[in-house]
């Protein structure tokens, strides 16, 4: 029988392809077209319960419910919209956890920033998510649901997906890749419009390349490595987990990934005022990028509670960028969005959890 993604003791249909759902219907003693109907209602009509799929025989719907099979949609807990129309959603899982996702609109695109885990074990000093540690990894349906929920809430088709929300995607690599397959095949978001971010996990980049090729064929999504420092000492200060992954080893693995996939790597660099944004740091970063098929994305820090890091001035950001450009580094500056509504990753979720504890 078709293996279904598991939610505790329940099975979720969200995340299955049309072919999988056709096979599922046949195994249930139904015609294969019933599987195609389920697929349409889940991915195009946004069905949230089996009972809402009125084209299915009621007897079969009731039977599926008795078996514990469900669509696997999340429940909205809270939504916040910033002045620039950036949307932040908090959604509840079957086991009472909270997932955070963000919709970032511009005139021509809608980017969904999805979470891959509930919490995060990496402990990056600038990140609100890591303050609470890791609870668990997300299932495929819980990842895909984030994109569908943003689409429904904003009444607009997402064009891009970035795995830059809560969690370390490479610690949930199989579900992330299955989610990418679903996003491309079932929701219609091209692989080139998807970015997977990682802080760097030893001995995983080659595995990612090989697994992605096995699951997706040719790798077309973008790998974004969260570098955030141009030397090992400073990187360990900002990212404690970097102590087990020397920066030279990380860059060596990135070059191997490029060889295996033919895709350039994007390096994320969060600018922390007075800490890693000086001219010498730009020079060191340019030296690291020499000979790399890569791109550097600069991000001005969004302050969070409990940390004393500062957001650099716009003039400092511009000077850092210009130094890199003058050294021949391909560089861009990410526009800050939703700063008036707890935009830093994990902030709204942490505040909500704190309120629940207080009450």
Swiss-Prot record:
One of its GO terms (molecular function) is metal ion binding. Its cofactor is [4Fe-4S] cluster. One of its GO terms (biological process) is rRNA base methylation. Residues 106-340 form the Radical SAM core domain. The keyword tRNA-binding does not apply. It is found in: Cytoplasm. Gene3D superfamilies: 1.10.150.530, Aldolase class I (3.20.20.70). The active site is at 100 (proton acceptor), 345 (s-methylcysteine intermediate). Belongs to the radical SAM superfamily. RlmN family. Reaction proceeds by a ping-pong mechanism involving intermediate methylation of a conserved cysteine residue. This is Probable dual-specificity RNA methyltransferase RlmN. The gene is rlmN.
């Amino acid at each position: 029988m078709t293996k279904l993604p598991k939610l505790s003791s329940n099975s979720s249909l969200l995340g299955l392809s049309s072919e999988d759902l056709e096979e599922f219907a046949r195994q249930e003693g139904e015609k294969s077209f019933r599987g195609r109907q389920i697929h349409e209602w889940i991915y195009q009509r946004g069905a949230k319960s089996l009972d809402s799929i009125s084209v299915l025989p009621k007897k079969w719907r009731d039977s599926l419910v008795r078996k514990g099979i469900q669509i696997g949609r999340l429940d909205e807990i809270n939504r916040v919209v910033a002045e620039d129309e950036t949307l932040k959603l908090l959604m509840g899982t079957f086991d009472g956890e909270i997932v955070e996702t963000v919709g970032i609109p511009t005139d021509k695109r809608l980017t969904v920033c999805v979470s891959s885990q509930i919490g995060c074990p990496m402990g990056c000093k600038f990140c609100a998510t890591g303050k609470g540690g890791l609870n668990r990894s997300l299932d495929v349906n819980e990842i895909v649901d984030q994109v569908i929920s943003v689409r429904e809430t904003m009444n607009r088709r997402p064009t891009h997906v970035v795995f830059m929300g809560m969690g370390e995607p490479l610690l949930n690599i199989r579900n992330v890749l299955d989610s990418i397959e679903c996003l491309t095949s079932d929701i219609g978001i091209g692989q080139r419009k998807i970015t997977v971010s990682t802080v760097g996990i030893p001995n995983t980049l080659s595995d990612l390349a090989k697994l992605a090729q096995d699951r997706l064929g040719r790798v077309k999504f973008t790998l974004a490595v969260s570098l955030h420092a141009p030397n090992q000492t400073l990187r360990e200060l900002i990212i404690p987990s970097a102590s087990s992954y020397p920066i030279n080893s990380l860059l060596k693995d990135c070059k191997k990934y490029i060889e295996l996939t033919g895709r350039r790597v994007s390096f994320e660099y969060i600018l922390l005022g007075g800490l890693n944004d000086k001219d010498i740091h730009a020079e060191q970063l340019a030296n690291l990028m020499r000979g790399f098929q890569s791109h550097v994305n600069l991000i001005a820090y969004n302050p969070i509670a409990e940390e004393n890091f500062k957001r650099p001035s716009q003039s400092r950001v511009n000077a850092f960028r210009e130094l890199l450009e003058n050294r021949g580094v391909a560089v861009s500056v990410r526009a800050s969005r939703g700063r008036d509504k707890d935009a830093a990753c994990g902030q709204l979720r942490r505040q909500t959890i704190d309120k629940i504890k207080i009450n």
